[in-house]
Amino acid sequence: MANPKLTLNDVLIRPIITEKSFSGEEYNKYTFEVHRDASKHLIKEAIEKIFNVKVEKINVINVKPKPKRRGIAVGRTRSWKKAVVTLVEGYRIKELEGQH
């Protein structure tokens, strides 16, 4: 269930800047880290308002924490949510184009 206190500016945390995520740009796919309580509808609304584009579909992945060690201390990374956003043909997010 979506958090009622979540605003559109709180939904998107950061774009994912990796080689794999940039390979999807030629298919109009952009990858973002999003708030864990954000729904697909809220993510779509935020992308369309912030970047002035039309969203075709959204795939959401809940990334599970990985075990990590530092000396004898054992811990885990945090869990987070990733959204792969597919834009309607002809739309681009210009702010993310030149970050290769």
Curated annotation (Swiss-Prot):
Name of a matching Pfam family: Ribosomal_L23
Gene Ontology molecular functions: rRNA binding; structural constituent of ribosome
Tagged with keyword Ribosomal protein: yes
Domain of life: Bacteria
Keywords of the record: Ribonucleoprotein, Ribosomal protein, RNA-binding, rRNA-binding
InterPro entries, alphabetized: Nucleotide-bd_a/b_plait_sf, Ribosomal_uL23-like, Ribosomal_uL23/eL15/eS24_sf
GO biological process terms on file: translation
Gene3D superfamilies xref list: 3.30.70.330
GO cellular component labels: ribonucleoprotein complex; ribosome
Subunit note: Part of the 50S ribosomal subunit. Contacts protein L29, and trigger factor when it is bound to the ribosome.
UniProt family annotation: Belongs to the universal ribosomal protein uL23 family.
Function, in words: One of the early assembly proteins it binds 23S rRNA. One of the proteins that surrounds the polypeptide exit tunnel on the outside of the ribosome. Forms the main docking site for trigger factor binding to the ribosome.
Protein name: Large ribosomal subunit protein uL23
Native species: Kosmotoga olearia (strain ATCC BAA-1733 / DSM 21960 / TBF 19.5.1)
Species lineage: Bacteria, Thermotogati, Thermotogota, Thermotogae, Kosmotogales
Gene, per the UniProt record: rplW
